UniProtKB/Swiss-Prot annotation:
The lineage of its organism: Eukaryota, Metazoa, Ecdysozoa, Nematoda, Chromadorea. The keyword Coiled coil applies. It comes from Caenorhabditis elegans. It comes from the Eukaryota. May have a role in tumor suppression. This is Protein dct-6.
C-alpha cells in the first residue's frame, strides 16, 4: 500500500540529479538549515552534511519511513558541523565546526561527494560565530568571532591558497558565546565574556587590501616594492587628515566644556551630553586607527629592508647564472675545437685540448654547486619566514591582546549579570518589525533593539529551574524565540501592549509551556519554520513536528514523525556487539538508559531498553544454542546483572536480574569504575552461577559469585578483595583464566597481576600469586587475546606479554612508533584478532586514535616477535570517539562510538593489504 501511494514520488526522486538511496548516519546533528532555492534540508551529521530532498521529506512525513539522504563529506573526524549559513548573493553555503570552516558549493549538494581540503580552513581558536559576504565573483570576505578575538579572512577562488587572514583583533578575555551580523553594511557583534556586550566593529578595508596585495605579490619583488611605496604615500596623506581631525575634535571638546561650565541648569532637549558621547567614540576610533597606522609603518620599513636584501641576493644569483651560461658556451666551443683537433691526428694537440676541456668542466661544476647550494635554499626559507612575519604584523595577528571594548568602535549595549547566569546563545530576529536580538542563558532571556541600543524586555526563571541550553532559534509565525535543553523545547513569546493615550508601546516576554515531544534523543539542534519544527539529536535522530495552524502563539503539536531514528538517548558510553547467527545485536548504554539494537542491512533498530544509565558493560558470548547472553552493567555506585535472550523465535528480551553494590566504613556507596567477567562464563539456563570482578574507587577489586535464580533478587557472595595498595585507582581491568579466575589491573605506570581471586583466604593479600610490574610510561589501554596481554602506552608504544599459566606474564617485545607519523601519541582502545599457525601466533592489532584506526600485524614465535608490519591507518568519520568494536565475522568492519555511532569499512585496497599477512592453513 505504501509503494502504491508513493510510487509517483519515487519516480520523481529517482529522476533528480544526484539522488542517492543512502541511510542517514547515527552521529551528532549539530546544525540544521533549509536551502531557500529548492527546499532541501541540510543537516550537519558529525563532520559531514546530509542533504535531504524536499520530496523525500514529504514522503517520510506521510509514510513514517526514515528519510534517504545524500552525504557530503566536509570535516570527517576532524570536527563537528555546528552551523550552516548561506552566503548572500550566492547559492553556496559556509559550514563551520568548532575549529574548522569550509565553503561548500551548491553543485556539491546534489551528489555524494567530498569537499576539497584546500577549501577547509583551521582557525587559531574556537569558532563562536561566522559572517560571510560576497565581494566579487571570485572573492568572499569572511569574519570570524573566535574565543580569542575577531578575525577577517579573504577567500579567493583563483589562488592556490584560498584563505588569507587580512585583519585580526585579539582580545585578552575568552569569549564563550556570540553572534555576528551586518546592518546597513556595518559589522555588528554581540558576545559574552562575563559581560553581555553589543557593538559595532571598526573595519579598515584599505588595510585589508594592503595585506591581500602583499600576500598575493610576496614573490614578485618589483611589484611588492611598488605596493609598499604606494602605501607609504597613503599613510602620509592619512596622517595629515588625522592631524586636522584631531584639532577639530579638540576644538569641539573645548567648546562643549565651556558650555557645560557656563550653564548651571540642564535645558530640556539639550544634546550636549550626546555630543560628548559621540566625541568619545571619535577619540577612541582615532586612537585605534593611529596605533594601527604606526605599527603598519614600522612593518613597511622592515619590509623595504628585507626586499632590498632579497633584491641583492637575486642579483648575486643572476650574476652566477649568467656567468654559468658564459662558461657553458665556452665549454661547448672547446668541445667543438677538440673534435676538429681529433681529425688532424696530432696526439699532442689532442691531449692539450682535452685537458683544457676538463679544466673548464671543473669550473662549470663549481658554479653549478654554488647555484644549487644550501645557501640559496636557506635564503628562500628565510624570505618566506620573514614575509609571513610581516603579514602577521600588518594584519594584526602578532599584536598583543587587548580589551574587547577597545576593538568595538561603538558600544551599543552592555549588561552584567550574575556569575552563575552564563549566556550561551544569541539569536537575531531580522524578520520582526524592529530588528531584535535575544540574549539567552539557562535562567534569563533578554530582548534588545540593537538599532536603538536598549533592552526592551527581559525575563528570568527561578534558580531551581536552571537548565543548560543546547540550541535556540527565532520563531517564524510569531515574535519570540525557542530554546532547547537536552530533553525539552520551551517557547518564549515577545508580546506587545497596545499603547494608551499619551503612553508609548510597552513590550514584555512571557514563557510558554514546553512542547509535548514524543520519546526522543538528547536535542542538539533546532530548525523552526512557520507552523512546523525539525529537531536534531546527539545520536543522529531527526524529529519533525507540525503545529496547529489556528494559533500563532499556542504552539500545540498536532503531528510528529521521526525522519531519522536515533541510536540511543544521549552519547554512547559503551557498546558490545553480539552475533546471533542470524543477525547482529548491539548492547549499548548511555547516561540515562541501556539499549538493545538489532542491525537490519545498514540500519539499526531499537528493540528494547531499560531506564537507568551506565558507563561500562561486560558480556558473555552469545550462545546460539541457548539463544541468550549474560551482561554485567556498571553504573555509578552499583552493578546490575542482566540477561539478554530470545523469548520467542524473533522476540528479543532484556531482563534485569538484580544489582550488587559495596559500601565503605561510613555506609556510603563506593563509586564503580569498571567491570569484567570471568572468560569461562557462558550463557546457561537458570539457575546458574556467574563470576565477575568490579573495580572500585577505593583502590580495591572485589570479585563476586552470583547465584542467578531468574528472579529480581539473587544470592551474591563477595569472594575476595584485592587491595591494590601501590596504585591510586583502577584504570584498566581484565579478568583471565586463573584458579578459577585472575585479573590484570593497571594504573599509570604500574601493572598488577592477581591470580585465584575466588579464594577465601584473605589473610595472604600479598602472596606469591601477585606480580607487580613497574613500567616506564603510563598505561592507556589494555587488551587480552589468546594467551597474550597487550598494553598501549602514552608515549606511542605497545608491549606484548605472554601468559605463563601460573599467574605471571613475560615480556615478548615492544613496538615503538606505533602511529607511524600520525600526530597522535596515546595508544587507546586496543582490539585484537589472533590466529594460531604452524609458524606461531599471528596478531592483528587495531588501535583507535582521534581520527584513525591503526592496524598492525605481529607474528609471535617462541615467545619473541618474529615479524612486525604496519598495515594501514584507516581514517574514520567519528569526531571525538570513545571506543570501537569489531563487527563479528567481518575482519574489515568496525563500529566506532561516542556521540552516536559510525560503521566503518576498510577499502578494497586495504583489505588486500591485510590479506597479504593472513596465514591460510588447513588443519
Amino acid at each position: 500500500m505504501i509503494e502504491s501511494t508513493t510510487s509517483h514520488q519515487d519516480f520523481q526522486q529517482r529522476s533528480m540529479t544526484g539522488y542517492a538511496l543512502e541511510h542517514p548516519s547515527y552521529r551528532i546533528r549539530g546544525a540544521l538549515f533549509r536551502h531557500q532555492d529548492d527546499g532541501r534540508l541540510l543537516s550537519g551529521c558529525g563532520g559531514d552534511i546530509e542533504v535531504i530532498h524536499a520530496l523525500e521529506l514529504e514522503r517520510s512525513q506521510h509514510t513514517c519511513l526514515p528519510v534517504r539522504v545524500t552525504n557530503v563529506v566536509v570535516f570527517g573526524s576532524n570536527d563537528v558541523v555546528r552551523l550552516i549559513q548561506p552566503i548572500e548573493g550566492t547559492e553556496d553555503v559556509i559550514v563551520n565546526g568548532d575549529y574548522h570552516v569550509s565553503i561548500v558549493q551548491s553543485v556539491e549538494l546534489f551528489e555524494s561527494s567530498t569537499v576539497s581540503k584546500s577549501r577547509i580552513l583551521k582557525l587559531p581558536g574556537k569558532i563562536i560565530a561566522v559572517n560571510a559576504e560576497k565581494h566579487s565573483n571570485t572573492e568572499l570576505l569572511l569574519v570570524f568571532l573566535l574565543e580569542t578575538g575577531i578575525f577577517h579572512y579573504s577567500f579567493c577562488a583563483h589562488t592556490s591558497t584560498h584563505f588569507q587572514c587580512i585583519q585580526a583583533f585579539r582580545c585578552n578575555r575568552p569569549i564563550t558565546s556570540g553572534l555576528l551580523w551586518r546592518d546597513s553594511g556595518l559589522l555588528h557583534v554581540a558576545y559574552y565574556d562575563g559581560f553581555v556586550r553589543v557593538g559595532v566593529v571598526h573595519e579598515q578595508y584599505d588595510d585589508m587590501l594592503l595585506v591581500k596585495r602583499v600576500a598575493v605579490n610576496r614573490n614578485n619583488l618589483s611589484v611588492l616594492l611598488d605596493v609598499v611605496f604606494e602605501e607609504i604615500g597613503r599613510i602620509q596623506k592619512f596622517e595629515d587628515t588625522e592631524k586636522q581631525r584631531r584639532e577639530d575634535m579638540l576644538t569641539t571638546s573645548k567648546s562643549l566644556s565651556d558650555k557645560l561650565v557656563a550653564e548651571e541648569e540642564v535645558v530640556e532637549g539639550d544634546t550636549t551630553n550626546d555630543d560628548f558621547a559621540k566625541l568619545k567614540i571619535e577619540f577612541k576610533n582615532q586612537s585605534i586607527r593611529c596605533e594601527r597606522v604606526s605599527q603598519r609603518l614600522t612593518s613597511l620599513r622592515k619590509l623595504i629592508t628585507i626586499i632590498k636584501s632579497a633584491l641583492d641576493m637575486n642579483d648575486q644569483i643572476e650574476q652566477m647564472i649568467s656567468l654559468l651560461v658564459d662558461e657553458l658556451s665556452e665549454l661547448e666551443k672547446l668541445e667543438q675545437l677538440c673534435k676538429e683537433v681529433e681529425r688532424t691526428g696530432n696526439q699532442n694537440l689532442i691531449g692539450k685540448s682535452w685537458i683544457a676541456v676538463e679544466e673548464k668542466q671543473m669550473v662549470v661544476e663549481e658554479l653549478i654547486a654554488k647555484v644549487n647550494s644550501d645557501q640559496i635554499k636557506k635564503h628562500s626559507d628565510v624570505w618566506e619566514q620573514k614575509i609571513d612575519q610581516i603579514i602577521d604584523q600588518l594584519n594584526g595577528c602578532s599584536e598583543a591582546a587587548k580589551d574587547m571594548r577597545l576593538i568595538i568602535s561603538q558600544n551599543i549595549f552592555e549588561h552584567r549579570g550574575d556569575k552563575k547566569d552564563v549566556f550561551t546563545h544569541f539569536v537575531l530576529d531580522a524578520q520582526s518589525r524592529d530588528i531584535t536580538l535575544y540574549c539567552l542563558s539557562g535562567l534569563t532571556t533578554m530582548a534588545i533593539y540593537p538599532r536603538k541600543g536598549k533592552r526592551v524586555a527581559s525575563i528570568s526563571l527561578d534558580a531551581s529551574f536552571a537548565t543548560c541550553l543546547t540550541a535556540a532559534c527565532a520563531m517564524k509565525s510569531a515574535e519570540g524565540v525557542y530554546v532547547a535543553d537536552q530533553n525539552n523545547v520551551f517557547p518564549t513569546y515577545f508580546y506587545r501592549n497596545r499603547p494608551k493615550a499619551g503612553k508609548g508601546e510597552k513590550r514584555y516576554l512571557d514563557a510558554g509551556n514546553q512542547l509535548q515531544l514524543p520519546t526522543f534523543d538528547s536535542i542538539s539542534s533546532i530548525l523552526v519554520e512557520p507552523h512546523q519544527m525539525i529537531l536534531g539529536s546527539v545520536t543522529g535522530g531527526l524529529l519533525h513536528l507540525s503545529f496547529d495552524f489556528a494559533s500563532n502563539y499556542e504552539h500545540f503539536v498536532v503531528a510528529s514523525s521521526i525522519l531519522a531514528h536515533p541510536i540511543s538517548s544521549g552519547s554512547v558510553n559503551c557498546i558490545k556487539l553480539l552475533a546471533t547467527g542470524e543477525s547482529l545485536l548491539a548492547l549499548h548504554c548511555t547516561d540515562t538508559e541501556i539499549v538493545v539494537s538489532e542491525k537490519d542491512q545498514e540500519r539499526w533498530h531499537r528493540v528494547t531498553h531499560h531506564t537507568g544509565g551506565a558507563h561500562a558493560i561486560a558480556v558473555t558470548p552469545f550462545s546460539v544454542d541457548e539463544r541468550g547472553a549474560f551482561a554485567v552493567v556498571a553504573s555509578d555506585t552499583f552493578v546490575r546483572l542482566k540477561v539478554l535472550q530470545y523469548a520467542e523465535e524473533s522476540l528479543i528480551g532484556l531482563h534485569d536480574l538484580g544489582e550488587s553494590r559495596a559500601e565503605d566504613e561510613n555506609g556510603h556507596p563506593i563509586e564503580v569504575l569498571n567491570v569484567s567477567l570471568d572468560p569461562s562464563m557462558q550463557y546457561r539456563q537458570l539457575p546458574c552461577k556467574l563470576r565477575y570482578a568490579v573495580g572500585f574507587a577505593d583502590k580495591a577489586i572485589r570479585t563476586y559469585v552470583a547465584l542467578l535464580t531468574g528472579q529480581h533478587d539473587f544470592n551474591v557472595q563477595e569472594k575476595f578483595i584485592a587491595q591494590i595498595e601501590p596504585l591510586f585507582n583502577v584504570q584498566n581491568m581484565i579478568c583471565f583464566h586463573g584458579r578459577p579466575m585472575g585479573c590484570y589491573v593497571s594504573c599509570a605506570k604500574t601493572l598488577q597481576i592477581w591470580n585465584d581471586l575466588d579464594r577465601h583466604q584473605q589473610k595472604k593479600l600479598k602472596s606469591e600469586r601477585m606480580q607487580l610490574l613497574k613500567l616506564s610510561s603510563s598505561v592507556t589501554s589494555m587488551e587480552r587475546a589468546e594467551g597474550y596481554l597487550l598494553l598501549g602506552f602514552a608515549d606511542d608504544r605497545l608491549s606484548i606479554y605472554e601468559e605463563k599459566g601460573n599467574g605471571a606474564v613475560d615480556l615478548v617485545g615492544t613496538v615503538d612508533d606505533w602511529h607511524k607519523g600520525l600526530n597522535d601519541r596515546i595508544v587507546m582502545s586496543l582490539r585484537t584478532r589472533a590466529s594460531k599457525t604452524s609458524c606461531g601466533t599471528r596478531l592483528f592489532i587495531h588501535s583507535l586514535t582521534a581520527h584513525h584506526i591503526v592496524i598492525h600485524t605481529v607474528l609471535v614465535t617462541a615467545s619473541k616477535i618474529e615479524q612486525h608490519d604496519f598495515i594501514v591507518a584507516h581514517e574514520h568519520s567519528m569526531s571525538q570517539p570513545i571506543g570501537f568494536e569489531f563487527v563479528s565475522y567481518k575482519y574489515f568492519e568496525f563500529l566506532v562510538y561516542g556521540r552516536g555511532i559510525s560503521n566503518e569499512k576498510l577499502s578494497i585496497e586495504d583489505r588486500k593489504r591485510m590479506d597479504n599477512f593472513r596465514d591460510f592453513e588447513f588443519n
